[in-house]
Amino acid sequence: MIDPKLLRQDLTELKQKLAKRGYELDVDFWQQMESQRKSLQVITEDLQAKRNAGAKQVGVLKKNGEDATELLAEMQNISSEMKQAEESLKALQDKINQAALQIPNIPADDVPEGSSEEDNVEVRKWGTPRQFDFKVQEHSDLGEVLGQLDFAAAAKLTGSRFSVLKGQLAQLHRALIQFMLNTHTVKYGYTECYVPYIVNSDSLEGTGQLPKFEEDLFKLTNHTNNEAMGFYLIPTAEVPMTNLVRGERLDASELPLKFTAHTPCFRSEAGSHGRDTRGLIRQHQFEKVEMVNIATAAQSDELLEQMTGQAEYILQQLQLPYRVVKLCTGDMGFSALRTYDIEVWVPSQDTYREISSCSNCGDFQARRMGTRVKEGKKTELVHTLNGSGLAVGRTLLAIMENHQNADGSITIPEVLRPYMGGAEIISA
C-alpha cells in the first residue's frame, strides 16, 4: 500500500507518477473521500469535547448536591450521536483502505517509462547462444522422445498445463532444486524455510495479490457446501516467506533477513489463454526456489543488485546464456518499485524468456503487513524484496534445449552431476 499521506496531499503529482505504469488515479474520488473524512473527524472530535465537558459538569453538580438528570440525558444523546459518528468514520476509513489496496506501488525515478515488455531496457548479457550443427528440437519433443516428459498422462490425471516427469528428467528436476537451495544457503547465507502451500487471505493481501488479483489464484472451497474457506494455494513462496514478519517489530541489528524456500506454485493463468500452451513455459503447477529479503530502507537498493546477481550465478554455473533487463513502468508487478528480469536463451524459440524476476517493493508490502524496524529511537517500515532463484521448470527446459545433442540426448551440466550419481548424459 502506498503512503496514505500521498492521497491527502498533491494528488496531481501522484496521478502523474501512477499514470507512468498505466494506472488511472481517480482524483475526484480521493478528494471526496478526504473531504468526508475530515468532516466526520471534526464532528467526532466536537462530540468528544462536548462529552468530556459534560462529564466535568456532572461531577461539579453532584459535588454540590445539585440535580444532574437533565445534563445526563443530554450526555446520553451526545454519546449516541458520537457512536454513530464513530461508526460512520470507521466505515468510511474501511472504504478508503479497501480503495487504497487497489493502487499499485509508485515506480522508482530510475525505472524506464513504457507500456509493455517492448519498452524494457537490457542491462547486460552473459554467454553466447550456441550455434548448433543439427536441427534444434524443442524441449517438449526431446522429453517425449526420451519417454521422460509426459503431457498426455498429465492431461489424463488433471488437465491442460500440467506435466509428468519420469526417470532421469525427474532426477534432473530434483537436482536443480538441491543445487539452487545449496547455493543460496551455503554460498549466500540464506535461511532455508519450509512453508505452508496454503495461505489465508491476510497473507495474500500483505504481499499484494489480494484483493486485486484473486482471479489468478486457486481458492479452496468447502466440498460440503461449496463455500469459500478463506484459503488459497500459494502462487509463489514470496507470499508465506514475506508474511513470516507480518505484524512484527524488528530490530535493525537483525536485518537483513534472508529467506529461501523451494515450493510448488499454483497459478490459474487467467490472462494467458492461447499463450505457451505447449511445454513447460506456462503451467498451472510449477516448482520454484524463491529468495526473500527483509531489510532497512538504506539496505534495499544494494540488496536488489545482490539478489539479481545471486540468481545470475545459478545460470552461469549451468552454462546457460541469459540477459538481464530492467522492467519499464508498465511491465512491473503490482507491488514492485523496481524490477530486474533475467531471461534465459531458448534455442527453439530463438529468443530469451523470463526465468527470474527480482523486485524491490520498498515499504509497499510492509505497510500492508504492519512490519516495522526499530533503529535507535526511530521506528519505520521495513523494505521487502523478492526474487526467483530460479523457476525450476524453465531452468530444466533451458538445460534440455541448450545442452541437447544430435542424437536427442542431453548433456548434464557438471555442477549437477554429483546430484545425479555422476551421470553425464540423459538418454532414452
Curated annotation (Swiss-Prot):
<dbReference type="InterPro" id="IPR010978">
    <property type="entry name" value="tRNA-bd_arm"/>
</dbReference>
<dbReference type="GO" id="GO:0004828">
    <property type="term" value="F:serine-tRNA ligase activity"/>
</dbReference>
<dbReference type="GO" id="GO:0006434">
    <property type="term" value="P:seryl-tRNA aminoacylation"/>
</dbReference>
<dbReference type="GO" id="GO:0005524">
    <property type="term" value="F:ATP binding"/>
</dbReference>
<keyword id="KW-0547">Nucleotide-binding</keyword>
<dbReference type="Pfam" id="PF00587">
    <property type="entry name" value="tRNA-synt_2b"/>
</dbReference>
<dbReference type="GO" id="GO:0005737">
    <property type="term" value="C:cytoplasm"/>
</dbReference>
<feature type="binding site">
    <location>
        <begin position="354"/>
        <end position="357"/>
    </location>
    <ligand>
        <name>ATP</name>
    </ligand>
</feature>
<comment type="pathway">
    <text>Aminoacyl-tRNA biosynthesis; selenocysteinyl-tRNA(Sec) biosynthesis; L-seryl-tRNA(Sec) from L-serine and tRNA(Sec): step 1/1.</text>
</comment>
<feature type="binding site">
    <location>
        <begin position="267"/>
        <end position="269"/>
    </location>
    <ligand>
        <name>ATP</name>
    </ligand>
</feature>
<dbReference type="GO" id="GO:0016260">
    <property type="term" value="P:selenocysteine biosynthetic process"/>
</dbReference>
<comment type="function">
    <text>Catalyzes the attachment of serine to tRNA(Ser). Is also able to aminoacylate tRNA(Sec) with serine, to form the misacylated tRNA L-seryl-tRNA(Sec), which will be further converted into selenocysteinyl-tRNA(Sec).</text>
</comment>
<dbReference type="InterPro" id="IPR033729">
    <property type="entry name" value="SerRS_core"/>
</dbReference>
<dbReference type="InterPro" id="IPR002317">
    <property type="entry name" value="Ser-tRNA-ligase_type_1"/>
</dbReference>
<feature type="binding site">
    <location>
        <position position="290"/>
    </location>
    <ligand>
        <name>L-serine</name>
    </ligand>
</feature>
<dbReference type="InterPro" id="IPR045864">
    <property type="entry name" value="aa-tRNA-synth_II/BPL/LPL"/>
</dbReference>
<dbReference type="InterPro" id="IPR015866">
    <property type="entry name" value="Ser-tRNA-synth_1_N"/>
</dbReference>
<keyword id="KW-0436">Ligase</keyword>
<feature type="binding site">
    <location>
        <position position="388"/>
    </location>
    <ligand>
        <name>L-serine</name>
    </ligand>
</feature>
<keyword id="KW-0648">Protein biosynthesis</keyword>
<feature type="binding site">
    <location>
        <begin position="236"/>
        <end position="238"/>
    </location>
    <ligand>
        <name>L-serine</name>
    </ligand>
</feature>
<protein>
    <recommendedName>
        <fullName>Serine--tRNA ligase</fullName>
        <ecNumber>6.1.1.11</ecNumber>
    </recommendedName>
</protein>
<keyword id="KW-0963">Cytoplasm</keyword>
<dbReference type="InterPro" id="IPR006195">
    <property type="entry name" value="aa-tRNA-synth_II"/>
</dbReference>
<dbReference type="InterPro" id="IPR002314">
    <property type="entry name" value="aa-tRNA-synt_IIb"/>
</dbReference>
<comment type="similarity">
    <text>Belongs to the class-II aminoacyl-tRNA synthetase family. Type-1 seryl-tRNA synthetase subfamily.</text>
</comment>
<dbReference type="InterPro" id="IPR042103">
    <property type="entry name" value="SerRS_1_N_sf"/>
</dbReference>
<keyword id="KW-0067">ATP-binding</keyword>
<keyword id="KW-0030">Aminoacyl-tRNA synthetase</keyword>
<dbReference type="Pfam" id="PF02403">
    <property type="entry name" value="Seryl_tRNA_N"/>
</dbReference>
<comment type="subunit">
    <text>Homodimer. The tRNA molecule binds across the dimer.</text>
</comment>
